[in-house]
Amino acid sequence: DPYEVIGRELPDVVIHLASIVSPTTRAFAHSVDVVGSRNVIAACSLHGVRRLVVTSSGAAYGYHADNPVPLVETDAIRGNVEFAYSDHKRQVEEMLAEARKAVPELQQVVLVVGTVLGAGLENQITALFHKPRLLALRGCESPFVFIWTRDLARILKRAAGAGPTGVFN
């Protein structure tokens, strides 16, 4: 329970990484991704947390043929309702945007990270690279953005400290 933990510890900074990436029921994923994030944001606001660092995903922009390449921070958040992960990331980013207006004293750093790669890390995207062939469509770009675990750790450390606030792809 974020209210209990944040209320007991009274941290200056909260780093919120929780998200469901692997397939599960939509209801469970929603409870973790959206309801959990809502509770973290509310608990941070209630208990006077100075800074909230959240990892998001490019999936929040949605999977649309007219998305610009590359996507930048000012592009519209249009997560697809038909894809739970994309829809949930959109909802969380919308909640964060609302909180920036309602609770401006809660500094936010929203990191829109790509697929995380690193030693011992396995996910749906890394599984594609273990197959005998990597599926691609000729003449069709499919841009992926990757980040190494160590680089992400350094970015999170800076975000939790004196780094700038805002949304960063």
For the regions a protein language model found, what residue spans apply to each?
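NAD(P)H-binding glycine-rich loop region in Rossmannoid oxidoreductase-like domains
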Residues: 1-35, 46, 63
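Conserved cofactor-binding/catalytic machinery of classical short-chain dehydrogenase/reductase
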Residues: 13, 36-39, 51, 77, ...
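Conserved Rossmann-fold NAD(P)-dependent oxidoreductase catalytic core, especially the SDR/UDP-sugar
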Residues: 35-85
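Catalytic helix-loop patch of NAD(P)-dependent Rossmann-fold dehydrogenases
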Residues: 67-116, 138
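NAD(P)-dependent short-chain dehydrogenase/reductase
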Residues: 100-149
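A recurrent short beta-strand within the Rossmann-like NAD(P)-dependent oxidoreductase core
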Residues: 163-169
